[in-house]
């Protein structure tokens, strides 16, 4: 049985990780443990690079907390221009898989608060009246009226980040370069 460390205690993220591992390895083939670790980036990362660094840093910190595990999973949501998205980083042994989620264009009323230094989740809570938006459907769930959720969008990206660990083509050695 695989021991999977989720570098988060957020239920929406842990549910997405559970769905992805169910799809790839099957129910009952792993156990997930959530740990609260620092991302090393601001609470609201801005830009793809900063957001990706946050996800990688979460994995690094989770590995330090639980080095005996088999998988470490980091998810970091960010803002780039007028879009929200997230990076998924998964490590297993000495390999890494990464994927970026789908993006959602945000309305100006939300972006205004973000430009003033507030987090997307806090802005969504004020506008929607839902205090724990980030732990439920997220901005995605609110704006799509539940057709998509934070969990469903992250699930898809996590499936892509898991590909290097189960697709045999990723295990094949690179062909050697021909002599010149």
UniProtKB/Swiss-Prot annotation:
| One annotated GO molecular function | metal ion binding
List UniProt keywords, sorted A-Z.
Hydrolase, Magnesium, Manganese, Metal-binding, Nucleotide metabolism, Nucleotide-binding
In terms of domain of life, where is this protein from? Bacteria
**At which positions is substrate bound?**
8-13, 68-69
| GO biological process terms, semicolon-separated | nucleotide metabolic process; thiamine metabolic process
Q: Which Gene3D superfamilies match?
A: 3.90.950.10
Q: Which reaction does it catalyse?
A: XTP + H2O = XDP + phosphate + H(+); ITP + H2O = IDP + phosphate + H(+)
Q: Which cofactor does it need?
A: Mg(2+); Mn(2+)
The entry's Mg(2+)-binding residues are 38, 68
Q: How are cofactors bound according to the entry's free-text note?
A: Binds 1 divalent metal cation per subunit; can use either Mg(2+) or Mn(2+).
EC number(s) on record? 3.6.1.73
In which family does this protein belong, per the annotation? Belongs to the YjjX NTPase family.
- Give the quaternary structure: Homodimer.
Q: State its role.
A: Phosphatase that hydrolyzes non-canonical purine nucleotides such as XTP and ITP to their respective diphosphate derivatives. Probably excludes non-canonical purines from DNA/RNA precursor pool, thus preventing their incorporation into DNA/RNA and avoiding chromosomal lesions.
Protein name, UniProt field:
Inosine/xanthosine triphosphatase
Q: Which organism is it from?
A: Yersinia pseudotuberculosis serotype O:3 (strain YPIII)
């Amino acid at each position: 049985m695989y021991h999977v460390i989720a570098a988060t205690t957020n239920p929406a993220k842990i549910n997405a990780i559970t769905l992805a591992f169910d799809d790839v390895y099957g129910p009952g083939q792993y156990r997930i443990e959530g740990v609260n670790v620092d991302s090393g980036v601001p609470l609201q990362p801005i830009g793809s690079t900063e957001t990706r660094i946050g996800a990688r840093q979460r994995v690094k910190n989770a590995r330090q907390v639980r080095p005996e595990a088999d998988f470490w999973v980091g998810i970091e949501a960010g803002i780039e221009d007028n879009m929200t998205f997230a990076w998924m980083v998964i490590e297993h042994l000495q390999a890494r898989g990464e994927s970026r989620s789908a993006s959602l264009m945000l309305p100006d009323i939300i972006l205004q608060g973000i430009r003033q230094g507030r987090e997307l989740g806090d802005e969504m809570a004020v506008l929607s009246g839902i205090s724990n938006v980030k732990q439920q459907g997220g901005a995605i769930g609110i704006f799509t009226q539940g057709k998509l959720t934070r969990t469903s969008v992250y699930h898809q990206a996590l499936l892509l980040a898991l590909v290097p660990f189960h697709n045999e083509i990723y295990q094949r050695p690179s062909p050697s370069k021909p002599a010149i």
